[in-house]
């Protein structure tokens, strides 16, 4: 099926029109519930006919969508409708009749002979076709949004002044060459200029026209539309750039060949000459009220009634066919179609003449204003189930459309009820949008310590790299709102310094981890809507303000909003290949860890019967925060992946979307970094489609055209095509289906080249068996249950589908729209912090000073201005340091004693009457403040003079003139006194330094006095004095020191250890120490783990010290109640059977026998359970031991499994005999396994 991405053609294809007429006739009397079946059956029957009249369902869908836009084209270029929404479907073009061809050629010659047409079309060879939607580079900006997702009409596609509006600067920006970027050219003779002029004027006279002179160099033929994606840079903020940013429009002209500049300039001059009278008439700036055009005025909302609409049944059938195409997923993006229908619902009739274009006879009714509104209302009524799946914010915006009342009252009430229910419902899994206190990545000892680096140099270098990274981030946060901020020039050198420190692979790995973790922290910023904050704002005015403020040139958030722009620019200016490679790996690892993790999984079928759960695994979802993190990771992973292949032209503009065969052949030889098809297929089989699909779509949307044609991407897209073609609302979870349809539809918008592949996939009838099987398994997991948890999906929907924000903007009611281009709101920026603070302080002080003092202040300022920079810096430094030191001195000598005295007086209050206590407290603290202020006035100036004198003595040379020294001291004293007085006022007098809520404090004092009185009346039996534990005969710290001394000597110098009696005495102290109650948990943990290590060292270093008494005493310590109750992590016995300990015992069978004796005693005494012991043995089976060691381990396990069966100690802990028997049985199995491992 030959196709081309165009909105519509001048002449619609005739076979499809005949089938539309036949279809309308056949479906007229079919019941509503059989429409879909008859509709599909009709095309199956037609598809078996002859080739001339053959029409597949896909061809018909392509034709119908294009014809629908063509029929309503008259409403695109005036203010009565929203921005035109062109179809993204490929138009199946058949050869028109001969008469039509002649007519088309005449019209083409007429258009091409007009200079105006050539100027407005910007070298576009198809002046009668509507511009194709442009391709953006990000998820937040829907492709083609310049032609769709905008709440104002786009009149730039109408073609010059003939489109119904006046001359503007935009008519010349595309064609007029930019002289600042031109190279010096050789002088062109007048003859050549004349030849070039004739060649440019006669370029469209026909295919047989030949140029009069040969160009100096060969120029490849190229047609560039001003709506193609070549004029938006890679990773730019939005797809609105071409329509809203004059600078980018002007840059797009640079890709024209320089040999055409003279011709373009001549055309511009001709255009000005032709429009001389019109320009003169538009010269006055002040336009009178009579001269205003209807489009410049704001009209009130007109009332409309759908009664008496002509051909109502015919229009209803058309809306039914349109609805069936949407239900069968024969439209690339269902949200795009909904936006188009809402626009049709809001159109108004200004009585303008209809656009002269071919309209199929079956759709002629849509050229009428009221018929168009009726058609849209019926379509929305048919798509009620789809509207109910929108999130609460989108539903609220949709219900703001006044013409939605044209729908049946029951439908509108159901939408309002559903919206209210969603707003009232709350779920514990909602995304936490509160501002987090964590702004930076915390230091983790296990990941960032010195042990994780090969040398001290790399460790020190990474600490410097970390500091430089955060300095760059802080600098960006302060300066990026400045209009003149330039990331490469201001932060590029700082980022270069990061890589200069070290590019060791370990450092790059840690830097990549830091980058990704900080990205996830910074991206989770508070983004509450006014509704969530409880603000009652005008939604229309708020939407307009958001359109102008959120980004520089877009009405919605850009591709990298807020702090994500810093990380994007950081990657863009990165000159380290090592960092980019490690960053790509880290992004993928984090993404896969979140995608495959089972920790955050939530199953939607928790309340379904057990037998139903066993039949299916899903569907599973993740928490909202996890989904948001995966989308961010996928976006940046795609950005880093495609960045080497997003080449730019010589002028800095991105290359047009051209599929280079050489590039495709070259990149086919290299295997991709990871298999997308395998990841998607595994998720579909495991019921994790709703987890993987959103981030996978985000990743695919970031890829370039060549990457999308690689084998792995093609296989992944075929799987998505199969899912999109087969997924339906019926018998499936509606919210899950909506998320899947919206994500895949958005991908087709983000990558318009994929639309042809989708329709070609639907048209084929063989070779998709494996895909169908996978899709059937996935859809089975999405089957609908009565008890499914819809609220979870409601919270996940706006995060998994962030493009709903653009959809909301597109359907927001707009009664006033002028040009379709948004103006900038220049952010009011502060000056440098020092200047702003000094100016504000000067203004405050100047307003309070007398004229004489103001004059004195001016003299001081003039004096400081006359001094050099070092002197001014000296005065500022001494002022700051003396101010802080005097504050500390005053706190120690004045404020703290004053507060202690006031607290002592409060403790002396004995009354229990609340009013009396409150009055006493007020008097006490009031006197304390007055006394503190009095002492502050008396002593602070002395403290200040003393500090100033000491500071100047240390900083100034001894030969400094006394007058100059006193001048410096006076300047410092004046500034410091002002700061001290401000600190006293804000931090003491107007703060809670002395007390908090005085009423609450009075209540506490009354309650305390009342309790004391009650206790005294009871005879003093309720004393709460601290009771110390009895003396145990030794110092605990001395005991711990002795234990550490034994461990140290046994490890290094066993010959220096004490005697066996000293060891027995140590264990007796341990038995007494663990019986002390209410000691810190770490104290018991040190004793228990220390004894474990002590017995290990005795086995390997001093086996003659180990006897039954030592083992029994150790078991009694481990069985103490304090150690049994402690839940320290790691546990006491975690290192009992370690790999290093077994390696040390490998050459000694006696060591294994002594270990067996210890473990048997521990099992019999109940110090350890058999199941816990099994867990300690399990890591040993991951090692490759020698047959001798395996034999000794097997014998050890066999003896332990037999020794503990008759023990009754495990009953004391509450364990059942069955569990203990199973543990011993498992130990026997481990013994057999260890004995037979050497045979494998």
From Swiss-Prot:
Region (Disordered): 105-162, 179-218
Localization annotation: Cytoplasm
Coiled-coil positions: none
InterPro entries found in the cross-reference section: Codanin-1 (IPR040031), Codanin-1_C (IPR028171)
Highest taxon above the source species: Eukaryota
Pfam family, one: Codanin-1_C
Main location: cytoplasm
Disulfide bonds: none
Phosphoserine modifications at: 156, 166, 1234
Keywords of the record: Cytoplasm, Phosphoprotein
Effect of residue 358 to C: In strain: Oregon-R
Annotated effect of mutating residue 1146 to G: In strain: Oregon-R
Tissue: Ubiquitously expressed. In larvae, it is expressed in all imaginal disks, salivary glands and weakly expressed in the gut.
Effect annotated for changing residue 136 to T: In strain: Oregon-R
Record's compositionally biased regions (Polar residues): 128-155
Compositional bias of kind Low complexity: 113-127
GO biological process: chromatin organization; imaginal disc morphogenesis; morphogenesis of a polarized epithelium; olfactory behavior; regulation of cell population proliferation
Listed PANTHER family: CODANIN-1 (PTHR28678:SF1)
Function according to Swiss-Prot or TrEMBL: Regulator of cell proliferation and cell survival of differentiated cells independent of cell division. Essential for imaginal disks formation. Not involved in cell polarity.
Protein name: Protein disks lost
Species whose genome carries this gene: Drosophila melanogaster
